[in-house]
A protein has these predicted regions:
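Sec-dependent N-terminal signal peptides
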Residues: 1-8
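Sec-dependent signal peptide cleavage junction
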Residues: 10-26
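Aromatic-residue-lined binding/catalytic grooves and analogous aromatic/hydrophobic interfacial grooves
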Residues: 22-412
Length: 412
């Protein structure tokens, strides 16, 4: 089931950019060999490091529990992280009378009215053709939402971001840049050439191993991988800078770094939900622990393994596992340690096999050919009405996006 949802997640995320204006290109679209681009979203530039860039241009990955969006930056890679159970709202020590958001009466024109009567009024308004009154009354059926979280109305929260800050690279000197999401394997990649060295990053979120895996390589020439790894939880609504400060999005956490592993552990202030993430950095060069980061130096191959979890449990009335912070730490560490005991090729093979078990059940051939144009260029031609017949078959404008970084973001 989860693998199927992962397939749907990737497939339906394809056309999310089709619903938005496409930024103008400043140079000719770089062409690629067509057979390399079958079932791929690919671009010749990074996603803007902004809310708009996240929503329309980052590359989404997920395993039904952990979500990741890859921006593909050159001097700084940003991978936005999510964990499906990280919600504010619900039972809390500050809400002893919390009743699941159910309300028995609501205020209609200054009078507390039973919900059953409101429903009857809505039906009568629709029947008489008074849609404006019906719509106004429908709003009375919705639980109260407030940023302070006093009513227990919850929001889905961004976990935070993993940042890879690269050293010794001048972005303007990079060539042959390509950022792609392969729908056949559910792997997001970034590659480019710099000073005679070919740099590649691969990312996937494995359902069998319950981890996000990021692999970086540097081949050819004398170039090495030199960068810092950081994991920064969000303390703002939706993980963006657009709505900071409200209590229902705030959290407390500690970051510890030991032996090339970054552990973030904390609680949400609103409902005391515990969360934990662990990120292990494995490199063929050197790794150095910092206060809140791991520094990689002189490497040609680096694997980063991350897992995230909370103490949420779908069980009335507390909706918690009852785990201590230490027990949650042990559980997340177990995922990471088991995955780290496998080599990268094994992790990737496990992921691809699991994903393709579902994805390859159906193959739809519309007579299209792999495109030699980037995905954003295809969308530009489609919107302008200049796409060829074959290119129109590649358009995803008929499908529906499933991701949103806002507080009501949908996640499988």
């Amino acid at each position: 089931m989860s693998a199927a949802l992962s397939a749907v997640l990737l497939a339906t995320s394809v056309p999310s950019a089709a619903f938005a204006a496409v930024p103008a290109k400043t140079a000719d679209v770089q062409t690629k060999a067509a057979d390399e681009n079958e079932l791929k979203l690919w671009y010749d530039e990074k996603a803007p490091d902004s809310y708009d860039g996240w929503e329309k241009w980052s590359l989404p990955l997920g395993n039904s529990g952990i979500g990741a969006s890859v921006f593909g930056g050159i001097t700084q890679e940003r991978i936005q992280l999510n964990e499906k159970s990280l919600w504010s709202g619900g039972p809390s020590a500050s809400r002893t009378n919390y009743n699941g958001g159910n309300i028995e009466t609501t205020n209609v024109n200054g009078v507390q009215t039973k919900m059953s009567k409101v429903v009857k009024q809505i039906q009568e308004a629709f029947a008489s053709g008074n849609t404006s009154t019906a719509e106004s009354l429908c709003a009375k059926l919705v639980g109260v939402s407030d940023d302070a979280g006093t009513n227990g109305y919850g929001y889905y929260l961004s976990y935070g971001n993993m940042y890879l800050d690269f050293k010794g690279i001048t972005e303007s000197s990079v060539s042959n840049y390509k950022r792609a999401l392969d729908l056949h394997t559910a792997v997001a990649s970034v590659e480019y050439d710099y000073n005679g060295t070919h740099y590649v990053r691969e990312n996937f979120v494995s359902y069998p191993d319950n981890v996000l895996v990021t692999k970086l390589t540097a081949t050819g020439g004398s170039g090495k991988l030199n960068f810092d790894v950081k994991v920064n939880p969000d303390n703002e609504k939706g993980g963006g800078s657009n709505n900071p400060g409200a209590n229902s999005y705030q959290r407390d956490w500690n970051t510890k770094v030991n032996g090339g592993e970054i552990t973030v552990a904390g609680t949400l202030k609103d409902n005391q939900m515990k969360f934990n993430s662990q990120t292990k950095v494995i490199a063929d060069g050197t790794t150095t622990d910092g206060t809140d980061k791991v520094t990689v130096a002189n490497a040609t191959s680096v694997t980063i393994i991350t897992s995230i979890a909370t103490d949420y449990k779908d069980e009335y009335p507390k909706y918690r596992t009852g785990e201590s912070a230490e027990a949650l730490d042990t559980r997340v560490g177990g995922y990471v340690d088991k995955a780290a005991a496998k080599d990268y090729d094994t992790l990737k093979a496990n992921h691809v096999k699991d994903y393709q078990n579902i994805f390859e059940r159906v193959d739809l051939d519309l007579g299209q050919i792999p495109s030699d144009k980037t995905t954003d260029a295809l969308l530009q031609h489609y919107k302008a009405g200049t796409a060829t017949e074959a290119e129109r078959r590649l358009s995803g404008s008929h499908a529906v996006p499933v991701w949103s970084l806002s507080d009501d973001r949908i996640f499988p």
